[in-house]
Amino acid sequence: CSEGVGYYNYGFRAYILLREEVYRATQGKIDFFQTPKFVRIARYGKKIQMNEGVCPAYSDCRIGLSPDRFILSYCDRALGVTSAEEQPVLPKGNNLSLHLLELFTSRVAKVGMTDGIRQVLQEESDALRAYYEQSVIFIARPAGGTSCRLAISAKGGTNAENHNHNDVGSYAVALGSETMVGDQGGPNSYPGDYFNGDAPQKYKIKGSFGHPVPVVDGRTQSSGCLLYT
């Protein structure tokens, strides 16, 4: 998702509830997670992290956001990659069905394993790096059990993506739990004209001038798909 962790938390959380309700209503005959594509979406919450709880704030993702603990726990349990130990998460939001699901995490419906799902789980198991081909986002993490705490991320893609900031070439560098330098992310709220065509010039946070990318010959990056990496 080129729009980052914030929209992942919002959208995928709702999809989890839909999956549970349909799964239970059909007694497991319809499972929206029963595809290899779901595995990639489910692992995004862990793989987009540079260090634990630290994610790059590209596009309109606000800096400091991290994947929802409930989503991470739910996906691990659905895929059978955690122990059976109960790990309840304090509920958030205003949906009673999700509240109950978060309090009783052992009730998560397990995904039936297929060769395709096992293959994607293996492909998504790299602990050191992640690369998202469509959004052209790269993550490199320190190896576990070492003293290194430095992690990096870089973003390519185009300037025609959802919630784009005309920031091809942006990056983030994290040391431990702190983002030391890089993309400042999106605003806490949107002005009424934030999505107008001239917004990248009016609001520096939405244009390349407000990002860690070069200003070449006094010119900032333009919008559109012609600018890409």
What are these regions (language model features)?
Residues 146, 220-222:
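Active-site/binding-pocket entry motifs
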Residues 228-229:
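Conserved small/polar residues in nucleotide/adenosyl-binding loops
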Residues 186-220:
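Conserved active-site neighborhood of enzyme catalytic/cofactor-binding cores
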Residues 1-3:
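Acidic/His metal-coordination segments adjacent to aromatic residues that form catalytic metal sites
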Residues 10-180:
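Carbohydrate-active enzyme catalytic cores, enriched for enzymes
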